[in-house]
Amino acid sequence: MTLATPNHIVRPAKDLDEVQDLYWPLMQELGWNRAKEDCKTHYTVSKSWLLIFPESCKTPQGMLLPLIYPNKTAWVAFFIMNAAYRGKGLGAALWREMETLVSAAQCSFIGLDAVPEQVQTYTRRGFVDCARVPLMSRKSLVEKPLGIKWGYEDAVELQDLRDVDPVYLTQLDLEHTGLDRRAYWAANVLPARRDAFGYTIVEDGELTGLIYARRCPDGVRIGPLFAATYAQARQLLHKLMNDYARMEGTFAAEIFGTNTEGRKLFEELGWEYAGVSYHRMWKDGKVPEEQKEGSMGATGMYATFDAASG
């Protein structure tokens, strides 16, 4: 017997508070280790954070964030329902609205990072499992000091990420991911977060590497990490970790599994596999060139930014 979907309304959030009042309790319930400030970041970037209101409710009971980037790529995130409203067809209503928006934007690539339990759900919706994104974690340097030392004969000069024109941050990101995330790298968004900072590498006037980190409930989340060489990736990660030398809590990062050196790098600095990997899935198996085997992403993206945005 098929149950009827309750009457409902799907619409974009009116303001940040409307999203955050649903987002924050769900993040705590699911243990996704995302900060309140992350919600503000994604809301600022997205023009259509979708919420669903069952007829009997004055507050939203589910959400879905479709991120539509300027280069006709899209990312699907935060597809979540409150427990009492799961299994009633409301998620399908949210999904249809997302598909309408993505179709209207004529997106060529649509991706998402799925938790293992949801892979079959997305497979039925036409997504193909194309890569893994292992979650890595590390105890603080207070609890577990760095046990490795090396010379810096080949070290390069690092610059504060905020001193680099967002146009160049966007371009380096695009070259590694195929996603045009200029709205994230705008001066008033990621670079402006008070709970975050990062470093870049500029060689011969060209931006070749960057690392970014932000606070999360359990400690600090690192990513993205792009670098032209393993040595430079190690220098960026080592520097950033040392800047959090007195931090309590843990480090977290999402590793781009297609880069075989990514996990090795983090393990060299004392990180461990957290026991779970996201499944990077693409609609109809269409993967941006920048993330395929042998691409710049496969050799230079050591950590992704966030499962919520690619």
Task: Locate each region found by the language model.
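Structured C-terminal portions of repeat-based eukaryotic scaffold domains
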Residues: G205-G257, K264
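Amide-forming acyltransferase catalytic core, primarily the GNAT-like/NAT-type
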Residues: Y23, R125-R221
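Active-site/acyl-donor-binding loops of N-acyltransferases
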Residues: D113-A114, Q120, R125-G147, T250-G310
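Conserved acetyl-CoA-binding loop-helix of GNAT-fold acetyltransferases
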Residues: F78-M81, G87-A104, Q120-R124, Y230-D243
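A conserved beta-strand-loop-helix scaffold within acyl/acetyltransferase catalytic domains
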Residues: P6, V10-N82, D180-V220, P224-A228
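Conserved GNAT acetyl-CoA-binding A-motif
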Residues: A74, L101-V115, R246-T258
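Residue-level recognition of the GNAT/N-acetyltransferase active site
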Residues: N82, R86, V115, A228, ...
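A short, well-structured alpha-helix characteristic of acyl/acetyltransferase catalytic modules
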Residues: T2-T5, D15-L26, K144-E153, R162-E175, ...
